[in-house]
């Protein structure tokens, strides 16, 4: 049987998360709770304090949707995995709102059919998206960025900057886009860190 670690960044729905953690009994679970959700963090810490297979990130990040803070939270999870010195065949980044559709045996069989050691990462070219990389997004890390006024202001600022300001910091890089979710090997995680 393959050894699995499941990492997740969560912000809500403690009951759903408890169902998920129970369903993942065959692996270790690493949880990052959004820094804005102190009550959830304290509750989960208390619930899992005696569970040797559940680990919680203590140095948490205030996560804003589609902001770099999502990457920071993911890196903190990977650093926590590495710090335990537990070796896994695969590390899976999932949502706290997920539920597994496969058993441990089915998951192992699927991975083995694709080749143990392969990474499962969605990657797409960005040809239809490149124009957006030249624009600055002003409110990505603002916790209010989903409010209508901020969205309208962001759109207005983008339109104003279009003819005058072009972001240049990606020149020389071949960029791709994809999902946040992945399943990677331990060696791949070490390479990332």
Label each PLM-derived region with a short phrase.
Residues 1-193:
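ER/Golgi luminal nucleotide-sugar-dependent glycosyltransferases, focusing on the catalytic module
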């Amino acid at each position: 049987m393959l050894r699995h670690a499941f990492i997740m960044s969560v912000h809500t729905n403690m009951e759903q998360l408890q169902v998920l953690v129970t369903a993942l009994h065959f692996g270790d679970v690493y949880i990052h709770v959004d820094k804005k959700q102190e009550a959830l963090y304290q509750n989960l810490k208390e619930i899992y304090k005696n569970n040797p297979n559940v680990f919680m990130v203590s140095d948490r990040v205030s996560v804003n949707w589609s902001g770099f803070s999502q990457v920071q939270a993911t890196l903190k999870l990977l650093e926590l995995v590495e710090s335990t010195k537990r070796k896994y065949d695969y590390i899976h980044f999932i949502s706290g709102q997920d539920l597994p559709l496969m058993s441990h045996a089915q998951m192992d069989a699927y991975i083995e059919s694709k080749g143990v050691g392969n990474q499962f990462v969605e990657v797409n070219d960005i040809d239809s998206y490149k124009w957006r990389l030249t624009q600055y997004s002003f409110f990505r890390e603002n916790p209010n960025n989903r409010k209508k006024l901020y969205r309208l202001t962001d759109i207005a600022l983008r339109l104003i900057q279009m003819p005058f300001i072009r972001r240049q910091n990606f020149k020389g890089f071949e960029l791709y886009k994809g999902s946040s979710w992945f399943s990677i090997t331990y060696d791949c995680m070490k390479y990332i860190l």
